[in-house]
From Swiss-Prot:
Function: Minor protein of the capsid that localizes along the inner surface of the virion, within the central cavities beneath the L1 pentamers. Plays a role in capsid stabilization through interaction with the major capsid protein L1. Once the virion enters the host cell, L2 escorts the genomic DNA into the nucleus by promoting escape from the endosomal compartments and traffic through the host Golgi network.
Species classification: Viruses, Monodnaviria, Shotokuvirae, Cossaviricota, Papovaviricetes
Organism: Human papillomavirus 33
Keywords, comma-separated and alphabetical: Capsid protein, Cytoplasmic inwards viral transport, Disulfide bond, DNA-binding, Host endosome, Host Golgi apparatus, Host nucleus, Host-virus interaction, Late protein, Microtubular inwards viral transport, Phosphoprotein, Viral penetration into host nucleus, Virion, Virus entry into host cell
Post-translational modification: Highly phosphorylated.
Any one GO biological process: microtubule-dependent intracellular transport of viral material towards nucleus
Protein name: Minor capsid protein L2
Family: Belongs to the papillomaviridae L2 protein family.
Quaternary data: Interacts with major capsid protein L1. Interacts with E2; this interaction inhibits E2 transcriptional activity but not the DNA replication function E2. Interacts with host GADD45GIP1. Interacts with host HSPA8; this interaction is required for L2 nuclear translocation. Interacts with host importins KPNB2 and KPNB3. Forms a complex with importin alpha2-beta1 heterodimers via interaction with the importin alpha2 adapter. Interacts with host DYNLT1; this interaction is essential for virus intracellular transport during entry.
Length: 467
């Protein structure tokens, strides 16, 4: 039989033990100092507080919350909320009511009548007019001041040649002052101006090697784009849509939204469902403005893209920096070009056997009128005689009747033939040409097919067994 384990009883607290053992003197040594507050820590606080005051800090054996107001920095006061003061109003007079006064307020005494409508007009009484006449015999005297000598006012104009070009100076317009016109001199003298020589600034370039009229740039360094750094991946784009509409390579075009501007930086937001049309532009969230540069004698169209491969919990996106480029056209340096390149022309006929002459003098050639009636011509043939091939007749006419145009008479050269000419019509090739071939030779061992063993499925243990 299994014995039941006795449960552990909880010990009485120090306060409960102190109430029972104090009178009998059987208290443990740690009960009386803890209840009476005579422990070592209490004695340190008791005697140490005589020399140091920590009352404002709230240090004690309590919960450590800093007291009622909490912990505050030394030398500062806790924030207090200002209580708004209400404006003082005059007291309200309360009418006293006696015990014998009536509590019913009479409405007839306090009722006032309001007159509606406009007031009645007052009718004036008929009366005459009072006319008063008076006559004054004193003559009118006008005070006229004597006219003295007229004063002449002068206006002077000063021209500063430092701020005005002398070649465009014009005499000022006449000014009017007090009825007198004052004219300036009609001409401008050039002797009063100073001729300042122009200085040439120091230019850090060789004027003999200048090939264009492009202004000389300053000494300000050109900012590097950083397209070919180690941290930038290089991707070549072949699709021509990269030049005009690069957004079609990243996301699908939606005509319901506003179109993208290819000259600005493009921002994209991808979803996890639809991939990019071009796999090279996968996870691209930003495609910066285009830049046209020259790289190894080519005009290169470049754009820098930013990928968002990873995304942290805080929302920060991490991805690679890719340089997309497409070469437009090559640039040939000046050293590789030939300014006056001449080509040697080979004669079409042998000039040693031909004997003809052309008049070295000047002759006039008059064009005849175009004949409306075209004379049909027979097909002309040219013969080429060689030792390796047979004579072949090739028609040179296009099939249409060509009008005969008159001109200077130039005899055609005559060529001797090594073999008699036999015209053949129609023309067919004499030899049979068979075009057949392959780029590999199959080994003879592959022509023999191997015999395969037949397999019969016996489903004893769900495994096929070879017979």
């Amino acid at each position: 039989m299994r014995h039941k384990r006795s449960t552990r009883r909880k010990r009485a607290s120090a306060t409960q033990l102190y109430q029972t053992c104090k009178a009998t003197g059987t208290c443990p040594p740690d009960v009386i100092p803890k209840v009476e507050g005579s422990t070592i820590a209490d004695q340190i606080l008791k005697y140490g507080s005589l020399g140091v005051f920590f009352g404002g800090l709230g240090i004690g054996t309590g919960s450590g919350s800093g007291g009622r107001t909490g912990y505050v920095p030394i030398g500062t006061d806790p924030p207090t909320a200002a209580i708004p003061l209400q404006p003082i109003r005059p007291p309200v007079t309360v009418d006293t009511v006696g015990p014998l006064d009536s509590s019913i307020v009479s409405l007839i005494e306090e009722t006032s009548f309001i007159e509606a409508g406009a007031p009645a007009p007052s009718i004036p009484t008929p009366s005459g007019f009072d006319v008063t006449t008076s006559a004054d015999t004193t003559p009118a005297i006008i005070n006229v001041s004597s006219v003295g000598e007229s004063s002449i006012q002068t206006i002077s104009t000063h021209l500063n040649p430092t701020f005005t070009e002398p070649s465009v100076l014009h005499p000022p317009a006449p000014a009017e002052a007090s009825g007198h016109f004052i004219f300036s001199s009609p001409t401008v003298s050039t002797q009063s101006y100073e001729n300042i020589p122009m200085d040439t600034f120091v230019v850090s370039t060789d004027s003999s090697n200048v090939t264009s009229s492009t202004p000389i740039p300053g000494s300000r360094p050109v900012a590097r784009l950083g397209l070919y750094s180690r941290n930038t991946q290089q991707v070549k784009v072949v699709d021509p849509a990269f030049l005009t509409s690069p957004h079609k390579l990243i996301t699908y075009d939606n005509p319901a939204f506003e179109s993208f501007d290819p000259e600005d930086t493009l921002q994209f937001q991808h979803s996890d469902i639809s991939p990019a049309p071009d796999p090279d532009f996968l996870d691209i969230i930003a495609l910066h403005r285009p830049a046209i540069t020259s790289r190894r004698h080519t005009v290169r169209f470049s754009r820098v893209g930013q990928k968002a491969t990873l995304k942290t919990r805080s929302g920060k996106q991490i991805g690679a920096r890719i340089h997309y480029y497409q070469d437009l056209s090559p640039i040939v340096p000046l050293d590789h070009t030939v300014p006056n390149e001449q080509y040697e022309l080979q004669p079409l006929h042998d000039t040693s056997t031909s004997s003809y002459s052309i008049n070295d003098g000047l002759y006039d050639v008059y064009a005849d009128d175009v004949d409306n009636v075209h004379t049909p011509m027979q097909h002309s043939y040219s013969t080429f005689a060689t030792t390796r091939t047979s004579n072949v007749s090739i028609p040179l006419n296009t099939g249409f009747d060509t009008p005969v145009m008159s001109g200077p008479d130039i005899p055609s050269p005559l060529f001797p033939t090594s073999s008699p000419f036999v015209p053949i019509s129609p023309f067919f090739p004499f030899d049979t040409i068979v075009v057949d071939g392959a780029d590999f030779v199959l080994h003879p061992s592959y022509f023999i097919l191997r015999r395969r063993r037949k397999r019969f499925p016996y489903f004893f243990t769900d495994v096929r067994v070879a017979a």
